[in-house]
């Protein structure tokens, strides 16, 4: 697996841990780990001599292989496993010609490559899990600290109702916790050994095929599937889906943060730092750089996942083409997902919330944001339809006369006949109209540790 990202761009669009998991040397080592484990499994089950294991294991070191030469040879063989096995066999033969006879015994190229992909995915999930836990913890802290910080809830980008910022932060944490849940389930149940031999029947191993497969799965600590899955790619598609969903969740958070950072909104800001968020020409700017990185990654992820989904349509017992499409695509999806998440970790752990500005923005529409609260209070006396028409007319007058809605209502005899001045004033306190928000915050926070 190549990182498929330019070295100039990779640090901005991926995490260091994911780059390490997906780089060529790690991929090669995962393939060699399969070969070493296969030798151990076959020796343990009496398929190959025990004496062959040591020389094979010793030769399974990625650092001793020429990656460029393997890549060039793969263009002629159709996949990387063929030249790798050839080179590995030659290296083993230098130390023990007899042991070299048993390299890759009974396996096929796809067994090597797919199992290496499973090992890469496992490392990738571990890396994502660590960052997810950090982001969840950060947003949970914001939710607790700002559960009584009133802000504008926006629908269709317009002021709608008041809400506590803590609810928004708790929703962020919960969406990431659900993503973590998916990935943990995938790591536990969705990854699996690939081992079927030339056509998925393990025919070369005679009656020892399933016994070797079971031991090989144990050696690699991977679940043993009921049968090989060479051209049934739902496992890969499920991984792509979980990754793309996580990237999308990160993108949603990043979109909100970038909008809250707008000069005219100014409710929250990414953490400040030397040289961070500046413009090449405008020294006053504080750009949403982490949000932009997350959004860029989240924009790429769906198309990458779509390629993986398209590659599910494979022919018979070995695919000519669609399988190849997975090789550069899946690692790039892992990388950009990690990049989106890394940016969100940065935001979660350092978001600067301006509670005073949030309150100021609530007041910017001169009470119109509380129109629903007044409508429902009045509806208890005169019915919802009449209350709606009355408050709608009052809201239009408030806008036309440039007055606070509270002032207009206090002067309206149709309203004061049913609501006292004190009641009207109380209805314009944003945190008095938050519905089940506090209970929702608690429920969301309680859900964070579920697997």
UniProtKB/Swiss-Prot annotation:
| MF term (GO), any | lyase activity
PROSITE patterns assigned: FUMARATE_LYASES (PS00163)
UniProt KW Isomerase keyword:
yes
Q: Which InterPro entries match?
A: AdenyloSucc_lyase_C, Fumarate_lyase_CS, Fumarate_lyase_fam, Fumarate_lyase_N, L-Aspartase-like, Protocat_PcaB-like
Reaction(s) catalyzed by this protein?
A: 2-(carboxymethyl)-5-oxo-2,5-dihydro-2-furoate = 3-carboxy-cis,cis-muconate + H(+)
EC assignment: the record states: 5.5.1.2
Q: Which Pfam families match?
A: ADSL_C, Lyase_1
Tree of life domain: Bacteria
Q: Which UniProt keywords apply?
A: Aromatic hydrocarbons catabolism, Isomerase
Q: Please name the GO terms of the biological process aspect recorded for this protein, alphabetically.
A: 3,4-dihydroxybenzoate catabolic process
Family statement: Belongs to the class-II fumarase/aspartase family.
Summarize the protein's role.
Answer: Catalyzes an anti cycloisomerization.
The name of this protein is: 3-carboxy-cis,cis-muconate cycloisomerase
- The organism is Bradyrhizobium diazoefficiens (strain JCM 10833 / BCRC 13528 / IAM 13628 / NBRC 14792 / USDA 110)
């Amino acid at each position: 697996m190549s990182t498929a990202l330019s070295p100039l761009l990779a640090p901005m669009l991926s995490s260091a841990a994911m780059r390490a998991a997906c780089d060529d040397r790690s991929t090669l080592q995962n393939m060699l780990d399969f070969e070493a484990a296969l030798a151990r499994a076959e020796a343990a089950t009496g398929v190959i001599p025990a004496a062959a294991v040591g020389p094979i294991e010793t030769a399974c070191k990625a650092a001793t292989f020429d990656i460029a030469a393997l890549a060039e040879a793969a263009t002629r063989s159709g996949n990387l496993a063929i030249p790798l096995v050839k080179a590995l066999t030659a290296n083993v033969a230098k130390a023990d010609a007899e042991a070299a006879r048993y390299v890759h015994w009974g396996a096929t190229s796809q067994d090597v490559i797919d199992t290496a992909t499973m090992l890469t995915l496992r490392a990738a999930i571990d890396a994502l899990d660590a960052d997810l836990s950090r982001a969840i913890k950060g947003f949970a802290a914001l939710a607790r600290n700002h559960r009584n910080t009133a802000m504008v809830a926006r629908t269709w980008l317009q002021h709608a109702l008041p809400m506590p910022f803590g609810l928004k932060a708790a929703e962020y944490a919960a969406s990431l916790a659900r993503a973590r849940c998916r990935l943990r389930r995938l790591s536990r149940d969705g990854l699996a050994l690939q081992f079927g031999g030339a056509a998925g029947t393990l025919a070369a191993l005679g009656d020892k095929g399933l016994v070797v497969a079971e031991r090989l799965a144990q050696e690699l600590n991977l679940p043993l599937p009921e049968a090989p899955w060479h051209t049934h790619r739902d496992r890969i598609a499920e991984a792509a889906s979980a990754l793309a969903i996580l990237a999308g969740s990160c993108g949603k958070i990043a979109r909100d943060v970038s909008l809250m950072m707008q000069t005219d909104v100014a409710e929250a800001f990414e953490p400040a730092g030397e040289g961070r968020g500046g413009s090449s020409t405008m020294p006053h700017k504080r750009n949403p750089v982490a949000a932009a990185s997350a959004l860029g990654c989240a924009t790429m992820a769906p198309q990458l996942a779509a390629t993986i989904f398209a590659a599910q349509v494979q022919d018979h017992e070995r695919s000519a083409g669609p399988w190849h499409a997975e090789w550069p695509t899946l690692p790039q999806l892992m990388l950009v997902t990690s990049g989106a998440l890394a940016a969100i970790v940065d935001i979660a752990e350092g978001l600067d919330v301006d509670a005073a500005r949030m309150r100021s923005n609530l007041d910017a529409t001169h009470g119109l944001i509380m129109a629903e609260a007044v409508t429902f209070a009045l509806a208890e006396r005169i019915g919802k339809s009449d209350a709606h028409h009355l408050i709608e007319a009052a809201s239009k007058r408030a806008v036309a006369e440039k007055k606070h809605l509270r002032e207009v209502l206090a002067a309206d005899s149709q309203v004061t006949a049913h609501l006292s001045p004190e009641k009207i004033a109380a209805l314009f306190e944003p945190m008095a109209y938050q519905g089940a928000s506090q209970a929702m915050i608690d429920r969301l926070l309680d859900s964070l540790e579920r697997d």
